Amino acid sequence: MTQNPVKFVHPFPFEVPFFNKGMDKFVMKHLIRRFVNQFGMTYTSHILDQLKILGFQQATDAAISLGIDDLLTTPSKAWLIQDAQQRGFASERHHDYGNVHAVEKLRQLIEVWHATSEYLRREMNPNFRMTDPLNPVHMMSFSGARGSTSQVHQLVGMRGLMSDPRGKIVDLPIQGNFREGLSLTEYIISCYGARKGVVDTSIRTADAGYLTRRLVEVVQHLVVRKVDCGTIQGLFVNLIQDRETIKNKFVLQTLIGRVLADDVYIHGRCIATRNEDIGIKLANQLYYFQVQPIYIRTPFTCKSIYWICQLCYGRNTTHSNLIELGEAVGIIAGQSIGEPGTQLTLRTFHTGGVFTGDIAEHVRAPFTGKIEFNENLVYPTRTRHGHPAYICYNSLDVTINNQYEVQNLTIPPESLLFIQNNQLVESEQVIAEVRAKRSPFKEKVKKHIYSDLTGEMHRSIPMSNLILETTHLWVLSGSIYESVVVPFSSDQDQVDIPELLLDKHKSLSNYSVDQVKHESVDSNCFEKGKKILNYFETDRTIPNEHKDSIYSAILFENTHMSVKKEKNKLIVPLWCDKQWGKRRIPCPDFIFRIPRGQGILLNKKHIFAFLNDPRSKMIKYGNILGGYSIEKKRNSLENQLDGGPRLKIKKTYASLISVGTNEIIINMIQISLLKYPFFNIAKRENIASSPFLFHNKLGHTNLNDQSKLLSKGTIRSLPNENKKDESFTILSPSDFLQIVLFHDLKCLNTVKKLDANKKRIELSGLLGHLHSIANRFPYSHFMTYKKVLLTERSISNNDSNNFQLAKCYFMDEKREIYQFDSCRNIIFDFFNLNLYFCLSNFFEKTFSVVSLGQFCSESIWISEDKQLQGSGQIVVVHEESFVIRLAKPYLGARGATLNSYYGKILSQGDTLITMLYERLKSDDIIQGLPKVEQLSEARSNTSISKNRKKRFQKLNRYLAIFFGNFWGSFTSVRMTMEDSQNQLVDEIQKVYRSQGVQISDKHIEIIVRQITSKVLVVDVDRSENKNWENGLGSLFLPGELVGLSRVQRMDRALEKRINYRTILLGMTNASLNTQSFLSEASFQETAQVLAKSALQGRIDWLKGLKENVILGGMIPVGTGFNRLVKRSKMNSRTSQKSLFINKVEDFFFEHQDQALILSLKQKETSKNKKETSKNKKETSKNKKETSKNKKETSKNKKETSKNKKEASKNKK
């Protein structure tokens, strides 16, 4: 048996939409809105109860549960993360090369990982729909039952970038999710967010509650007590402009529920009239027809002083009707703003610390082809990531074509182009980046760039502390030795680090002779006028006119020699006899007995014991015979051998020789010993070097059994005002890198003399003259090169030798070229600074010139297939290689602050540069609530971002009004105040809209209206005020806060105008400057407010809610507001005329129409008086006529009674 289908006798009075799709939370929200609009709240709640029962029933029948297997990871996650890692590695390499600075690297890293996380989150919903549409996680989150997209993304996607407790983005992203598990490092980083959620839940909830209390306090007295205030002012809403600045779902919310302040016309047809409220249908019409601008009423311009009228407020947000009279709209507004902050602090417990933001919009190529555009319309620039690009300031037409199709693209203005003209692009390749239409939250922060090395700071161009243009800063590698004494070695000395001994106080015992007693000599041993006791045989005072120090000769076995300082000499003669003949102090003869392998060094202001082998005993090995003379030389004493036999020592040669095999990098400066002991002296400074240093290589056998390998270094002194604590750097072998220029070398240790006909080459060395050693050694090193000049062919040589020497040499610092027998036709181009090798029967090869002091980056190519393996400065140029002192380049951006000077010794971790840059503020509500509080309190450091270009364009339209108009200043003040109010509303809305929270603008406008309703009285001119003595001029004192409407009314009443300026009061200050002292005292500073109010004799009229609650009276809300509404005593004619006056448009604070209004009022008053007197006369006349009529009436009555009597008499 089938039942008859149900037929609706009375169909719906509207068209019912048919939903045949998955009901997610957005569709449900739309459906519920339609139900509320058509059926009301009661019927809608009944329908929703039925939907709830249906949903639970279906979930129970389907046995929906949630397990760990339901968490499905997106398949594209692997290659997305791999691509992001490769881009991160590329950015790291560019930073090491010095191509980008730290801010650009951090910015690119954040944007790359955020874009990866965002793409992964966007693919999550399509992946669930395609693979498992009935997945419980998918149904739960996308239906709105529990969980948001961000939380599900952390379960099955990736957590992404996290914020630390200070709000700074941690540059190490969390690549895992909760399904796959986190590594130990990722877990520790994610603990930031967990702790952040706990702290925010406990602490920030109290802050949000206090914010709600202050918001309610400032607007608690605002109640709807009137239907229409009669204002003609309003607010212009531009839908097209707002659509660019805010999201589309929030555009219509600025219109729905408002009341029009003027008629709206579309193509000459009026579709809406003044004082008509805007519903969904009318809002859609205005939006799609792009009517602009729309003039609506707002609480900003309501003429009511202590309340708000019904039409300026608009519809009630709970149901689609106009707000009822007696509604406490102030408390509703305060709670509407504060309550989302209280609720949203609880959200961070699950997603705390996750960085959120917007990704840039890219223009991609639709297909593979060749791209063409006008090169004259683009200009080179540098992107925010440090990459080269082009920028177009106007719209740019781009054409992409191939042999099959052609397509034209239009690039918006101020976009970045990443391609060149006539370049071949692939499909989906990013060709341009569109500038964001709305600027997100940004804050200026300082970024400190720290040194990664310990060393010395160099810069390429001279500059002050402020970097004026982008340049490189270099930190040359070196280690720091901190000492409490003045060092033995001076600037530019070369020393052996294991043998460098520094001590402040050294005893000279065991080195005594008869004349020298066992005394300890202090470091500051020879001061002016100080007696040196028991130093010589007889006490002697050194003269006062100079300071004295003592040098000692350094003794070697079987050798007597003294060393003097030379300039720019690599080979030093082992004997010098230069005398300084200023003042000689004769000394008695004495003998130093020095053990084998030991020596004594006496330096400036110090006494050192320089001991190679402290275990050796005192052995009489060599004597120095003859007297010594003490001479003055640069305020110091120098010991010279005076007398005795002088030895002639043969000339000694030294060479910097290096043998490389299979690209071995040798990290030291090699010095070879030839035949005799020698010293390496650098730039006129003292010597601290071992006498025997043989040529030794890593991985090679020693050529001499007596050779030993010691670490060499160069000392750079650090200027310091505090002489007690000096430091200097030691360049250890690890600070140098030797680059071998040839690809494949072989080392042959052959005992074979060179041919006699070989030409000996005298090459100018690094520090002086360098002699050839080819015929000096009994054995030589010969190198066989498989690849010479990196060509696969060997060089043809006419010589019949079995070995080949190096065919080419790099230039030294003097730019000199030497010709060899085995190499021909070497041409040097002084303009291109390149070395050309023109070999017979071969093509040319070009090498870049390297020179001493040149800075090289790691990214450069020193040959066709060899790339430089480290950045640094070239310090040594060999014949077939050069030595680089390792360094780290840092790119200093324009406007950065340099925290160090040229040549400063830096430790690892020292601040090198401080840069100021803008970073995105996190969109988390926890960072947003202080922003709301900052705006609401109108603090001085509040920065309101503006689109200046549009603001100036808007300003140009009003310049004609300002100039030549006496009232232009009043107009500008009014417009500035309105613009400030609108900006405050927009900034507060941005915080909540970023979290998807929808707050009506009228709530925020009520708050802003209260904090901008006071003005500050600036000055009262006593001399020109004629009414000063009768008290009118002293109505307001300078510095007094008065309501704007009150000042305007008093300004009309007084003959002298009141000077005032508009100010922004915060919530707290506005709550403490109200008409009710009971409300102020119950908020803050109770004793101070009550004492001040008692002294001023203030009266509280109990118009607000709070003061009535305190006193236990009826609050003026709902049915209790009628007792405060006073009936108008004006007659109908006067009220109509006053309504006509109120319709006059007023742009200048009603100043320009004041005379007209006063004259109209005076005429009106006189006319009313005349009409009143005329009415009085007519009334008296009417009274006389009435008395006359009464007499006639009484006479008629008497006649009537008389006639009745006659009639009765006739009847009888």
Swiss-Prot record:
Cofactor (UniProt): Zn(2+)
Catalytic activity: RNA(n) + a ribonucleoside 5'-triphosphate = RNA(n+1) + diphosphate
Oligomeric form and interacting partners: In plastids the minimal PEP RNA polymerase catalytic core is composed of four subunits: alpha, beta, beta', and beta''. When a (nuclear-encoded) sigma factor is associated with the core the holoenzyme is formed, which can initiate transcription.
Family: Belongs to the RNA polymerase beta' chain family. RpoC2 subfamily.
Keywords carried by this UniProt record: Chloroplast, DNA-directed RNA polymerase, Metal-binding, Nucleotidyltransferase, Plastid, Transcription, Transferase, Zinc
Organism for this UniProt entry: Cryptomeria japonica
A cellular-component GO term for this protein: chloroplast
Annotated cofactor note: Binds 1 Zn(2+) ion per subunit.
Lineage of the organism: Eukaryota, Viridiplantae, Streptophyta, Embryophyta, Tracheophyta
GO molecular function terms noted in the UniProt entry: DNA binding; DNA-directed RNA polymerase activity; zinc ion binding
Gene3D superfamilies according to UniProt: 1.10.132.30, 1.10.150.390, 1.10.1790.20, RNA polymerase Rpb1, domain 3
Protein name: DNA-directed RNA polymerase subunit beta''
Keyword Nucleotidyltransferase in record: yes
Disulfide-linked positions: none
Residues covered by region (Disordered): 1162-1212
